[in-house]
């Protein structure tokens, strides 16, 4: 029994589990959290019910962790071939495949319990979220557009939030959802540019490879479409003009990102990717201004 606990629950093992769930890298959680907050506050026309807000924040943390576990499980044979991912717990053997599968199921069970605390409408929508989380990691083997599936996975909290608050999916919901997809494809392409050379060598597909020398131009186009959809969203929602001012200020971050990725240097592309959480926060502030000003 002592040996069992030493193997599976030692301090080093807990650290490995935390790294597998990316608790040491909160950027992904933030990129998932901000669109969720957009939708919750937009659907409620202000502060959503506190219980719903807490459930969704916890759900974001849990599902982000689950997504990382299943992603690393799917990539366990190729992560060791990529410089950026070579030290991940599954790639180095610090976490076994059995442990990863058990952890994934445990996280899904926690998410299931959280879903039970919401209305039936949202509970049914949650099955799509689970399906997208499971499908996404395997898409890079079959298509150059896995980032689109990631955008759907990261954005599905938006219809769930509308469902939880209003039990409806109005046009505003879908404008936010598709804005999030275009934004996600843009920032995850920046992320994929970091690994492009390694991905080409091992045969992994991504939008960074698909877009090739047009990558920066297409990223800029995707960001422009994101802004157009967010402007339409604010107009239909009849937000105060302050929303558009804050959104415009947030959009200036895209110009900075384009400058960072201009030379396609790995470190600079990664900085551009990280910069996106400020945009997500900016849009959240814009929505608050639009509602309360």
UniProtKB/Swiss-Prot annotation:
Gene Ontology, cellular component aspect: plasma membrane
EC numbers: 2.5.1.39
Reactions performed catalytically: all-trans-octaprenyl diphosphate + 4-hydroxybenzoate = 4-hydroxy-3-(all-trans-octaprenyl)benzoate + diphosphate
InterPro entries (UniProt xref): HB_polyprenyltransferase-like, Prenyltransferase, UbiA_prenyltransferase, UbiA_prenylTrfase_CS, UbiA_sf
Coiled-coil stretches: none
Classification via PROSITE patterns: UBIA
Keyword Transferase tagged: yes
Subcellular location: Cell inner membrane
Pathway: Cofactor biosynthesis; ubiquinone biosynthesis
GO molecular function: 4-hydroxybenzoate polyprenyltransferase activity
Any single GO BP term: ubiquinone biosynthetic process
Membrane topology: Multi-pass membrane protein
Enzyme type, top EC level: transferase
Keywords noted in UniProt: Cell inner membrane, Cell membrane, Magnesium, Membrane, Transferase, Transmembrane, Transmembrane helix, Ubiquinone biosynthesis
Family of the protein in this entry: Belongs to the UbiA prenyltransferase family.
Role noted for this protein: Catalyzes the prenylation of para-hydroxybenzoate (PHB) with an all-trans polyprenyl group. Mediates the second step in the final reaction sequence of ubiquinone-8 (UQ-8) biosynthesis, which is the condensation of the polyisoprenoid side chain with PHB, generating the first membrane-bound Q intermediate 3-octaprenyl-4-hydroxybenzoate.
Name of the protein described by the UniProt record: 4-hydroxybenzoate octaprenyltransferase
Species, as recorded: Actinobacillus pleuropneumoniae serotype 3 (strain JL03)
Record gene name: ubiA
């Amino acid at each position: 029994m002592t040996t069992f606990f030493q193997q599976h629950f030692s301090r080093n093992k807990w650290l490995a589990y935390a790294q597998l769930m990316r608790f040491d890298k909160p950027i992904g959680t933030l990129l998932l959290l901000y669109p969720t907050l957009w939708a919750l506050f937009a659907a409620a026309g202000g502060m959503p019910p506190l219980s719903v807000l807490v459930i969704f924040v916890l759900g974001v943390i849990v599902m982000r962790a689950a997504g990382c576990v299943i992603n690393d499980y799917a990539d366990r044979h190729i992560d060791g071939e990529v410089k950026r991912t070579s030290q991940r717990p599954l790639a180095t053997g610090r976490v076994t495949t059995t442990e990863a599968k058990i952890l994934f199921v445990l996280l899904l069970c926690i998410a299931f319990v959280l879903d039970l605390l919401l209305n039936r409408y949202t509970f049914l929508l949650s099955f799509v979220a689970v399906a997208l989380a499971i499908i996404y990691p395997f898409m890079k083997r079959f298509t150059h557009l896995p980032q689109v599936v990631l955008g759907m996975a990261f954005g599905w909290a938006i219809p769930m939030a509308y469902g939880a608050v209003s039990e409806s999916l109005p046009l505003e919901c879908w404008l936010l959802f598709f804005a999030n997809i275009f934004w996600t494809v843009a920032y995850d392409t920046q992320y994929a540019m970091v690994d492009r050379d390694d991905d080409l060598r091992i045969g992994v597909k991504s939008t960074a490879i698909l877009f090739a020398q047009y990558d920066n131009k297409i990223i800029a186009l995707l960001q422009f479409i994101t802004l157009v959809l967010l402007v339409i969203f604010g107009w239909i929602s009849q937000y105060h003009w302050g929303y558009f001012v804050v959104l415009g200020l947030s959009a200036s971050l895209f110009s900075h990102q384009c400058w960072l990725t201009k030379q396609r240097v790995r470190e600079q592309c990664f900085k551009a990717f990280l910069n996106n959480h400020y945009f997500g926060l900016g849009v959240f502030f814009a929505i608050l201004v639009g509602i309360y000003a």
